[in-house]
Structure formats: C-alpha cells, structure tokens
Amino acid sequence: MNHFIEIRSYTLKPGTRNEFHRLFLEQAYPMLQRWNVDVVAYGPSLHDEDSYYLMRRFDSLAHRAHSEDSFYGSDEWRQGPRESIIACIEDYTEFVIELDEVTVQGLRK
C-alpha cells in the first residue's frame, strides 16, 4: 500500500531556529500526536541555520485535507502555539509525494 507523504520546508526568520525547534518539540509535536497525525521525520536542515523540515504521512489526499482542516482549525492550535510558531516562519513550501511503506519506514527518525 502506498502512502502520501507531505514534506514541508520552512525558511525561518534569522536566529529563530532553536526557538522554533523548542516550540515544535514541546508544543506542536505533542499536539500532532494527540490529533493522530503521523509525523515521519522533522528537524533542522543541515544546509543552513534558517531551515527546518517536517514530513507527515497520510493515507490519501482526502485524508490529508481532512486532517489539516481539523488540526489547523482547532481551538487547541489557534489558541495554543500557533502565534509563537508562525512568528518564527518567514516562508514555507510544501509538496506531496506518493511512497511505498518500505520507503516511508526508511525515512522515519
């Protein structure tokens, strides 16, 4: 069975990567787990000081849309870490690819 992997590449405001990582680990990641979002991998990029990545697995494009609408529309997100996290982000790009289970497992951290 293939899965849909969303890869987000964040360009963070200069000097905010450590704070972004802390906020992700302490607040966003636990929330994603509570919302049953399968986080495959995440972390600071190795190529510069202002980049970060997030990879999430979904069963279908419809599952991704529903999951994101539910999570980002929730009071927990909007009244929780949203503003602090967004304050660190200058820009981001996302794309979705389809991968088999073996490849997805190989990407997990």
Locate each region found by the language model.
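Glycine-rich beta-strand-turn "strand-cap" elements at beta-sheet edges
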Residues: 2, 38-53, 78-109
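Short, structured motif recognition centered on aromatic/hydrophobic residues
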Residues: 4-8, 20, 32, 51-56
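Short, histidine-centered active-site or binding-site loop motifs used for metal coordination
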Residues: 9-12, 46
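Short, surface-exposed ligand-recognition loops at beta-strand->loop->(often short) alpha-helix junctions
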Residues: 11-21
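Non-catalytic surface loops within mature trypsin-like serine protease
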Residues: 12-14, 60, 98-101
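Short alpha-helical
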Residues: 15, 27, 47-49, 62
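Short acidic, gly/pro-rich beta-turn/loop elements at beta-sheet edges
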Residues: 18-20, 64-66, 104-106
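An amphipathic, aromatic/His-enriched active-site/gating alpha helix that lines ligand/cofactor pockets
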Residues: 22-40, 57-95
